Amino acid sequence: MADLAPASAAQSLSTTASASNSTQASRATTPTGAPAEKPPDDSSKFKTFLGILRRFIGVSDLAAVRFSLPAQLLEPRPNLEYWHYLDRPDTFISIGDSDEDLGRMLGCLRFWFTKDLKYVKGKPCKPYNSTLGEFFRVDTTASYNMLAADIPQCNWKIEDTHPTLKTPNSAPSSRASSVKGDNKTVTVSYITEQTSHHPPVSAFYVDCPEKGISARGYDQLSAKFTGTSVRVSAGAHNLGIFITLKNRDNEEYQLTHPAAYLGGFLRGTLNVSVADSCYITCPRTGLKTILEYQEEGWLGRSQNKVIGVIFKYDSKNDNITKVKDVPEKDVLARIEGCWQDKVYYTLGSKPFNKVPEKHLIIDVNPLEPIPKIVPPLEEQLPNESLKFWEGVTNAIVGKQYTLATSLKTEIEEKQRAKAAERKAADKEWKPRFFTGSVTPIGRPDLTPDGEEALRGLHVEKYQLPHNKEYAAF
């Protein structure tokens, strides 16, 4: 499977910002028996990477192409460990706090602009591909405070102090980070599994019982190299993030992904940009958000600007896809700002620049991705991401790139051999923690094993029985 084709549309744009973002980091002792090699400099990496990509100009989807990157071009981190939408879980668990429909939609936006904080705080890199049946799980005991000055480096511990955002019927809040004062501790659990190899798809599930909120979805990418940049968009099975508020009559929000671009190859400074539209819809409340990302400004200067609108819509006749096409009478709020800086909103239908009172949705400047708790390595299964890739990770960290490439190639060959065995036996691989590889459409369901794994994370019981069969070894 192509190393450029991980399981999520954003995984190929992963950044080094969270290079030590797990309490059980994939950094163990340096392998013995192989000498350390001189690491390539960034310029050399770019030239090698660009040379590989140029072979695929015109290929419609790099995710469908088989090629292998040398280990020295990889970030020593598994995709499933790195990629998730909980860079700031504090914003996630506060989505359902408001008693007003508009307040909850604004809560979704606050989560949206922080879920991929790694792209704002770090530089692009390439983690490992996920193998079929590989999985990763996180247990986070958290008390949430968005602007905590001293973020712990071994877990997600912040106070549940997010206020609801101001709406026409709510009392004003002095700032988006003001404190509610209950200091409640909650637990957020997360599990993801590589459910398909062709095409590469992973399923994920997030659960916070104390707050009555969960999220699920499939991650899959489609990638194309244009000659100067890589355009990465959601694959056919990736319909976005589906968030359910159980305490709000199972109110569901669908958040779709915009296309992202990895550029800067010619300048030797890789960067992530977004120039596309995305949508947040809630059929129960009849509210929809359109966000339009505008990458380039005057004379090509990047502004990373985003504009948007929250409006009343007909879920049975949803055909409005552009901000300019939204009837003014249906507009509840307008959004504008820089997704790498501050994003604001105004209430009502008037143009954003004609409303004097602007409210802060989020300021990402003081924020960093929050570390996560994972099971101890000795309690992980052989196909659990950190343990599965341990040898490759250790070799890369020890600058033993020849050894790392050899170990990585061995993993790839074993996976192909297992796939050939299943094909010869006419046997279909079935995920362990999710009911289907790509079904139900858009919204994966947990198996009894998946539900049990989540329950174990809630109470810090990590031991799981071994698989009856492994897909990649």
Task: Explain the meaning of each model-derived region.
Residues A2-S94, L102-F473:
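Extended acidic, Ser/Thr- and Pro-enriched interaction/regulatory segments
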